[in-house]
């Protein structure tokens, strides 16, 4: 082990550490970071070399953050990344600095985004917030309006998580939706992601995603937003139902085919008793 450690350069150590961090399960960033910190045993190297991994993790996970002085949380995403550690809160029309390691927002300042698409963005945001409030107990959403390749584009991001460390599981839902504002009809593109980690009696992760495409009728801002939400709701309901049914089927068939729930004797083994019997027998023979 010592020989292997001597063979690894600082660059290779940082690369491995960064990979661990970017693959940390939802809600377990701090635990993974602390473990990596112990393994690397060089705080300066970790902070400087793996800073990009901290940022990438928050961008990928749609990390929600509360800005002091503002009621609603905002998501950290690539769509709100203004560079130099600054991010956009389109609802409150501010930008702020974000510490990717501490996950803290500071220095909020006024920021004017794309005015041409703002009325569309606001309408979609209003409709999406109502939808998220109804379907996600801990949901947060952020809606962006920007020009991409000369086209006015709406990007809607949703994040909802449950971190239950005391019960040995954590999970996160993310979805991202995009459409351009074009006359008559447009294409809606979405991606839905679920990641759950269960680690009480083992170590099991569910990582799933689904790509969505649908057509959206474009009329006025309010009506278009309503039609957009119908597409989002139908797709996300279908995805959630499919995931639930699929894993129920796996539990009833695949998992049972792989392993018996009870041994051949049809009796569960009390390993604690067996261990105590063995220890007692050894003590008697001593």
From Swiss-Prot:
The modification N-acetylalanine is found at residue 2. It comes from the Eukaryota. One of its GO terms (biological process) is actin cytoskeleton organization. Gene3D superfamilies: F-actin capping protein, alpha subunit, F-actin capping protein, beta subunit. One of its GO terms (cellular component) is cortical cytoskeleton. GO terms for molecular function: actin filament binding. F-actin-capping proteins bind in a Ca(2+)-independent manner to the fast growing ends of actin filaments (barbed end) thereby blocking the exchange of subunits at these ends. Unlike other capping proteins (such as gelsolin and severin), these proteins do not sever actin filaments. Belongs to the F-actin-capping protein alpha subunit family. This is F-actin-capping protein subunit alpha-2. It comes from Loxodonta africana (African elephant).
């Amino acid at each position: 082990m010592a020989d292997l450690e001597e063979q690894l350069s600082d660059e290779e150590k940082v690369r491995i550490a960064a990979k661990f961090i970017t693959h940390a399960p939802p809600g377990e960033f701090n635990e993974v970071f602390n473990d990596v910190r112990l393994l690397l045993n060089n705080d300066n190297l970790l902070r400087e070399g793996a800073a990009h991994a901290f940022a990438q993790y928050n961008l990928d996970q749609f990390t929600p953050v509360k800005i002091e002085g503002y009621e609603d949380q905002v998501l950290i995403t690539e769509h709100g990344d203004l560079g130099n550690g600054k991010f956009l809160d389109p609802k409150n029309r501010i930008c702020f600095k974000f510490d990717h390691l501490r996950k803290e927002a500071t220095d909020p300042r006024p920021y004017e985004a794309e005015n041409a698409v703002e009325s569309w963005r606001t309408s979609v945001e209003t409709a999406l917030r109502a939808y998220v409030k109804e379907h996600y107990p801990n949901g947060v959403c952020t809606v962006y309006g920007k020009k991409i390749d000369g086209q006015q584009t709406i990007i809607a991001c949703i994040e909802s998580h449950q971190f239950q460390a005391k019960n040995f599981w954590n999970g996160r839902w993310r979805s991202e939706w995009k459409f351009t504002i074009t006359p008559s009809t447009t294409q809606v593109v979405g991606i839905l992601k679920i990641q759950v980690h269960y680690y009480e009696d083992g170590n099991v992760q569910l990582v799933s995603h689904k790509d969505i495409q649908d057509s959206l009728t474009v009329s006025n801002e309010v009506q278009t937003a309503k039609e957009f939400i119908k597409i989002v709701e139908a797709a996300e309901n279908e995805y959630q139902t499919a995931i639930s049914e699929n894993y129920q089927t796996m539990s009833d068939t695949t998992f049972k085919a792989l392993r018996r729930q009870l041994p051949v004797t049809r009796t569960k083994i009390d390993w604690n008793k067996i261990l105590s019997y063995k220890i007692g027998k050894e003590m008697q023979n001593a």
